[in-house]
A protein has these predicted regions:
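Class I S-adenosyl-L-methionine
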Residues: 2-113, 118, 123
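Beta-strand/loop-alpha-helix module characteristic of Rossmann-like adenine-cofactor folds
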Residues: 2-6, 11, 38, 111, ...
Length: 154
């Protein structure tokens, strides 16, 4: 499933590692992390997985350095290395997948493969015994990277 084809482009796997517990990481996410020689991510998320992948090279950035983190992942892939960029929850739900696709334009020789994960919303709902049903919607209330006025308008 995650095997590189002969002549394939260099790749960055944007990997959702789930809401935090090892048992909440998908098999596909684990396979990508095993396959890649470089794992990039937010320092806190790297700390969650570092002990399981001690033979890897880790690249970290602090909060609010998301664009820099993406560029680091692309630059490592350009060197011919398989790279995982990890995010909590699902890579496409408040994760790094969107930003990676935006920045990819500057790195046409690198392919992006998104590996989905269990979202914090669905993981939390399961813990609480509160299924998300009937027109479920998610709106982030974090104003760390989005102005509050934009959040209120949503």
């Amino acid at each position: 499933m995650l095997q590189k084809e002969v002549g394939a482009m260099n790749s960055v796997y944007v990997v959702g590692i789930g809401p935090g517990g090892r048992d909440q990481m998908t098999r596909e996410a684990e396979a990508a992390l095993e396959r890649c020689s470089v794992i990039a991510g937010y320092t806190v998320y790297i700390d969650l997985i570092k002990d399981r992948y001690a033979d890897k090279t880790f690249l970290t950035t602090p909060m609010t350095q998301e664009a820099k983190r993406c560029r680091m992942a692309f630059e490592e892939a350009q060197k011919g290395r398989d790279v995982c960029l990890v995010c909590s929850g699902d890579a496409g739900v408040y994760g790094m997948a969107g930003l990676m696709y935006e920045i990819k334009e500057a790195y046409p020789d690198v392919d992006i493969k998104v590996v989905p994960g269990i979202t914090a919303a669905t993981g939390g709902a399961a813990v609480l015994g509160a299924p998300l049903m009937h027109d479920f919607a998610v709106i982030s209330l974090s104003d760390l990277l989005t102005p509050w006025e934009k959040i209120e308008a949503r």
